[in-house]
Amino acid sequence: MSHEPNPHLPIPAAWRKSVVAILRKGEKAQIVVKQRARDEFSARFPDAWPYDRNGALADALTPTEVLGRPIFGMDEPGEVWAFWFHFRNVKLYAKINLTPSGKLIIIYSAHVPLKGEDKL
């Protein structure tokens, strides 16, 4: 039995498919990026564009099985998952909310790991 407080679980395929479709479409009206996520990604990669970040996030969610951690207690309603992604060979932490409509995502986090590279 795992004593890990937040074990990594498979992220549901339906959630991943919806989020990837929104990220790949790239419509600003469907992607809310919180200021912290925008600032931290831009600080680490000042020459990157939003579509670069979105593409890296989508690529991370595309494999058949992706492990992550469900997140509860966010202000906005929806299903939130944290997971790892890579951009320019740098491991990054992501946290994304797929809102109940299934047509809008909120990117809360897109930054280098703050709690170590093994803790989501």
Question: Where do the protein language model's features map onto the residues?
Answer:
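Compact soluble domain cores
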Residues: 2-10, 14-77
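Basic/aromatic recognition patch in beta-strand/loop cores that engages polyanionic ligands
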Residues: 72-100
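Enriched for short, Lys/Arg-rich terminal
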Residues: 91-120
